[in-house]
């Protein structure tokens, strides 16, 4: 399968740099997986698409202000993007500098260079940093960090992004990118969904910077997926099994919820799904057999990305690429701050061939 098969033309003008004034005020492109039929609407149409007893599964990770600027004590500017918090004082981070720091290098971080840190070790492409500070990592980042907006949002982060680039139900800090499908849910919509009898459950997947890394191989099967930490607790397992037992749909809010649920299903030895607390590097592309997810709420993804491959595996390759072409023609807004899709699973997708 060629990565190039998942390319599409996207005008720069359709990349959203700010969200809509109202979270639920975005547009919604509905794709019926089995038929390929498209329907244009607004996000609150989700209420009409869901039935009492359906289960919405959200990712409750919280984005941390993971980007810091500073310099080496010895000189030279540096940019740090925290990928994973190891403990109260240590992190794994991506580091950009004219010359990579060696172990033992002292750093001054923050716009006012008030945070002292030391590079203690290197792990492949990541650097282990220790903060020489009484405060814990999260307190430091909240004080001096910048929100890590995606590379395609070509502007500096603003104070408003601390709220806007965060779901209203975010709870567990650790992500360096938002689970963006969830950004469209506001409290009135969540209340209306509950009133209709829609069940809700929460997984955690701390989205890493790897989610923005391009696929650098020509054939999909050669791609090595980055690892992210995920939690699917027992209450989510119980909710999924109860939903299936009553003949209703498990609806994943975002590709991170999909990857969490399907990771838990793949790791389960006997039942459909079992609790999961581990790193996952699951890579879902056409041919994958979905075990848990029946419908999906998701944003529009980058050309040739692993996420458009995941959607193609869910809705069918031809359905997905046609939907994206129509979204461009109808001037939907793309990527993290853009519009959304509601997709029902196409059971024939895994048999479909990919390409022209």
Swiss-Prot record:
Top-level division of the source organism's lineage: Bacteria
UniProt KW Transferase keyword: yes
Main localization of the protein described in the UniProt heading: cytoplasm
Catalysis: reaction(s): 7-aminomethyl-7-carbaguanosine(34) in tRNA + S-adenosyl-L-methionine = epoxyqueuosine(34) in tRNA + adenine + L-methionine + 2 H(+)
Gene3D superfamilies reported in the protein's UniProt record: QueA-like (3.40.1780.10)
Protein location: Cytoplasm
GO MF term list: S-adenosylmethionine:tRNA ribosyltransferase-isomerase activity
Record GO biological process: queuosine biosynthetic process; tRNA wobble guanine modification
One Pfam family in the UniProt entry: Queuosine_synth
Keyword S-adenosyl-L-methionine: yes
EC id: 2.4.99.17
UniProt keyword list: Cytoplasm, Queuosine biosynthesis, S-adenosyl-L-methionine, Transferase
PANTHER family in the record: S-ADENOSYLMETHIONINE:TRNA RIBOSYLTRANSFERASE-ISOMERASE
Role played: Transfers and isomerizes the ribose moiety from AdoMet to the 7-aminomethyl group of 7-deazaguanine (preQ1-tRNA) to give epoxyqueuosine (oQ-tRNA).
Family note: Belongs to the QueA family.
Oligomeric and partner information: Monomer.
Protein name per the record: S-adenosylmethionine:tRNA ribosyltransferase-isomerase
Native organism: Serratia proteamaculans (strain 568)
Gene name as annotated: queA
